[in-house]
């Protein structure tokens, strides 16, 4: 195994040189990530597989926060984007669990603007948040 530094739209790899790709929050929100997906088409070998994990804004507490923070991202359009390009969706339920409220608040403030973070934190109690993601996969 080797690790290379690069960007999704300019992978430092030869054509048809990769068997498995795993990308987590690298191809944000579907539309707009076409250059990165074109790179996957280039570098993944025939019968190779790519896996992409992305937020599922259509469900979960975090999903409702995400819709507030990023109202321009349409969950239905994102799903259509991936599925019309031959990707298969596996919904995954997970959870953020923190040892302190301060830790939860710190992470929420990384994810959202001050206004959105303040609002969702004021409405949410505790140190856990249910979080839904989509695992998108495609065989090449």
PLM regions and their residue ranges:
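A short SAM/SAH-binding and catalytic strip from SAM-dependent methyltransferases
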Residues: 19-34, 56
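Conserved Class I S-adenosyl-L-methionine
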Residues: 81-83, 88-140
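Short, hinge-like loop/turn segments at secondary-structure boundaries
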Residues: 22, 68-71, 107-108
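A short glycine-rich, Lys/Arg-flanked "PGG" loop and its adjoining helix->strand segment in the class I
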Residues: 34-49
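A short acidic, Gly/Pro-enriched loop at the edge of an enzyme's catalytic core
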Residues: 9-21
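Conserved class I S-adenosyl-L-methionine
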Residues: 49-81
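Class I SAM-dependent methyltransferase SAM/SAH-binding core
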Residues: 1-11
């Amino acid at each position: 195994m080797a690790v290379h530094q690069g960007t999704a739209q300019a992978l430092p790899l030869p054509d048809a040189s990769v068997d498995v790709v795993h990308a987590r929050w690298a191809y944000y929100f579907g539309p707009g990530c076409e250059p990165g997906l074109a790179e996957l088409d280039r570098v993944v070998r025939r019968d190779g597989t790519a896996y992409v994990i992305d937020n599922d804004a259509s469900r979960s507490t975090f999903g409702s926060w995400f819709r507030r923070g990023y109202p321009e991202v349409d969950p239905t359009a994102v799903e259509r984007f991936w599925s019309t390009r031959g990707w298969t969706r596996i919904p995954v339920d997970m959870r953020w669990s923190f040892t302190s409220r301060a830790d939860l608040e710190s992470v929420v403030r990384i994810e959202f603007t001050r206004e959105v973070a303040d609002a969702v934190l004021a409405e949410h109690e505790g140190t856990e948040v249910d979080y839904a993601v989509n695992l998108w996969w495609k065989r090449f």
